């Protein structure tokens, strides 16, 4: 069962991506994390949002969080932030510009 001071509390108090990797004992390349740290943590959050940890043992929660962080990290080893588009600004950059409304000149007569 999750307890105060458990892994979720520790992750909530973590102040850097490196803290997440250390707490969950996930190996990483510092050069990769320096470039895409926010993207990795955002993706991890996207994966975890559908998880329900209520009533689970802290070891099980830690193992699942580790799997999710490893997957989020792997996502950005295999592709770029522009391809993954985890942030709104990058999602919107992929959309073509909306056409400007046109008024027919014959309507103006």
Curated annotation (Swiss-Prot):
May protect the nitrogenase Fe-Mo protein from oxidative damage. Belongs to the NifW family. The keyword Cytoplasm does not apply. GO terms for biological process: nitrogen fixation. It comes from the Bacteria. Homotrimer; associates with NifD. The keyword Phosphoprotein does not apply. NCBIfam families: PRK00810.1 (NF002009). This is Nitrogenase-stabilizing/protective protein NifW. Keywords: Nitrogen fixation.
């Amino acid at each position: 069962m999750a307890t105060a001071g458990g892994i979720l509390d520790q992750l909530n108090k973590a102040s850097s991506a490196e803290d997440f990797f250390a707490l969950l004992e996930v190996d990483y390349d510092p050069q990769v994390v320096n470039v895409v740290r926010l993207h990795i943590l955002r993706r991890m959050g996207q994966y975890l949002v559908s998880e329900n940890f209520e009533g689970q043992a802290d070891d099980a929660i830690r193992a699942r969080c580790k799997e999710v962080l490893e997957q989020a990290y792997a996502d950005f080893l295999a592709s770029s932030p522009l391809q993954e588009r985890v942030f709104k600004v990058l999602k919107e950059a992929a959309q073509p510009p909306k056409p400007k409304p046109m008024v027919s000149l014959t309507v103006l007569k």
